[in-house]
């Protein structure tokens, strides 16, 4: 779980101005972790997550092969099927720096960060809404993808 140094007092967090579809947002975390593990790339450079369909952009040296695309989809679904708990904890920026990548953290982010962990598969600073267990996500389906100028755009959805 989280280190014992978790800030247990009521943390001051940045506000969250978007409403996400929880299954898709949790699936995005699994997709990001899968991409990092398979390709050694950073988490998505930008993401648009909705109930109907979502997209993520990844900086890659080459376009993934059809076999790799199928492997990404299969791996995300394999992790979903493990019925992993999604847990939330709070760490200071200093504590979080040894646990998660803070490179995309806005400069004005709170001193206390909300950390979302999906089993042992993914840990990430996040202020968004999530499912309580991966069993609530459904099936992850890649709709389409394109590659241009080193950016691989992946369009996907979750199906209940």
Model-derived regions: residue spans:
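Active-/binding-site microenvironments in catalytic and ligand-binding cores
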Residues: 1-160
